[in-house]
Design a protein with these regions (language model features):
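Short glycine/threonine-rich loop-to-helix capping motif typified by GTGT followed
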Residues: 128-136, 240-249, 278-283
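Acidic/histidine-rich catalytic neighborhood of metal-dependent amide-processing enzymes
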Residues: 2-68, 330-333
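C-terminal catalytic subdomain
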Residues: 104, 185-215
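Zn-dependent metallopeptidase/amidohydrolase metal-coordination segment
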Residues: 78-80, 102, 169, 187, ...
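A short beta-alpha structural unit
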Residues: 202-205, 231-246
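Short beta-strand/turn micro-motifs at beta-sheet edges
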Residues: 63-67, 184-189
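Acidic-enriched catalytic cores of C-N bond-cleaving enzymes acting on peptides and small amides
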Residues: 67, 74, 88-178, 207-229
């Protein structure tokens, strides 16, 4: 975007509309101070549309505009039993085992059909429209290639939905990490004093992270045996978001991306979460465009992270066209 602005200034002397740049470096640590900054500077940052580039193309040569993201609710669970690890031969059968209790809890959180069993979990879920399901089905998605890329033989998830629908637009619950007892080499037959785990729910529009947290606590307590204490800590959370497909800003972006990439973009949703999107939309009362130029195999956060120079140049052209297309909306509106 910066390069496209430089190009406009170098060739035309000015931009066709007012552009405000916000460079924020806390995204990887939760953007803790962003919301307060937006509120404190709302008048200076007032705008009709926010452009964020933190997404990707759908596939090589298939540019995409992301119009929806899942939200997230993230938790840490601790189950506490005896004051110290015990000998399972001496005490096993007489003292509740936190690891056993956690295994039973987790086994009950998702049923055989892949549905989350938290009370009220699906009450507020915004269902996909028939248009969305048809457009997702028409995308050039190679399921066998997807499995090969991941190194798995079978895919899993909620019954009644395609792989893309499950990844982009259905809520989930996943265990992100767990530990208990002895993890070293050889055998050590302990009855562990505690078990800890990290878990998260990916949410879709209309689901409230705090309501999900309350439901999760209630569900876990159903399987809490006597002699075990439970601590459930609710960490960061954010609701899902979806932008209307008929938004004039979305349609203007489609024209601009086509000019930059010489191919009409597809409209997609993504399964990840970008909490700042909700903050921009709510605090500034603005539409949000998610335009990403990278590829799914760019290995973000990895030591060998990359970005194609061809995509870089196409992105500059698309961004330059975007300012013109957005200016036309303002002029005609």
């Amino acid at each position: 975007h910066v390069k496209s602005i430089e190009s406009w200034l170098a060739t035309a002397g000015e931009l066709p509309l007012q552009v405000k740049l916000l460079i924020e470096g806390e995204e990887e640590v939760g953007s803790e101070h962003l919301e307060a900054f937006l509120k404190d500077n709302a008048e200076q940052l007032a705008c009709d549309c926010v452009v964020i580039s933190d997404t990707s193309q759908f596939a090589p040569g298939v540019p995409a505009i992301t119009y929806g993201l899942r939200g997230i609710a993230y938790f840490e669970l601790k189950l506490l039993g005896p004051k110290q690890d015990l000998h399972s031969g001496v005490f096993g059968g007489g003292v509740a085992n936190p690891a056993n209790a956690m295994a039973k809890m987790f086994g009950a959180l998702v049923d055989a059909d892949g549905r989350v069993t938290i009370p009220g979990f699906y009450d507020d879920v915004a269902d996909l429209t028939e248009r969305e399901r048809a457009e997702f089905a028409a995308l050039p998605f190679d399921e066998e290639g997807f499995k090969s890329q991941l190194g798995v033989e079978h895919l899993a998830g909620e019954k009644g939905f395609s792989t893309i629908e499950r990844r982009w637009a259905r809520p989930t619950l996943d265990i992100n990490g767990l530990t208990s007892g002895y993890q070293g080499a050889g055998a050590k037959t302990v009855l562990p004093a505690k078990a800890t785990a990290k878990l998260s729910c990916r949410l879709v529009p209309n689901q409230d992270p705090h309501k999900v947290a309350a439901g999760l606590k209630k569900r876990l307590e159903e399987f809490l045996p006597p002699g075990i204490r439970m601590k459930l800590v609710e960490h960061h959370g954010a609701p899902g978001i979806v932008m209307p497909l008929d938004s004039p800003y979305l349609q203007a972006a489609a024209v601009a991306v086509e000019k930059g990439f010489e191919r009409r973009p597809v409209f997609i949703r993504e399964g990840g979460s970008i909490p700042i999107v909700n903050k921009f939309a709510s605090v500034l009362n603005a539409d949000v465009l998610l335009l990403g130029w990278g590829q799914n195999d760019d290995n973000p956060h990895s030591p060998n992270e990359k970005f194609s120079l061809d995509d870089y140049h196409r992105g500059i052209r698309a961004s330059a066209a975007l300012w013109q297309e957005l200016a036309a909306i303002k002029k005609n509106g």
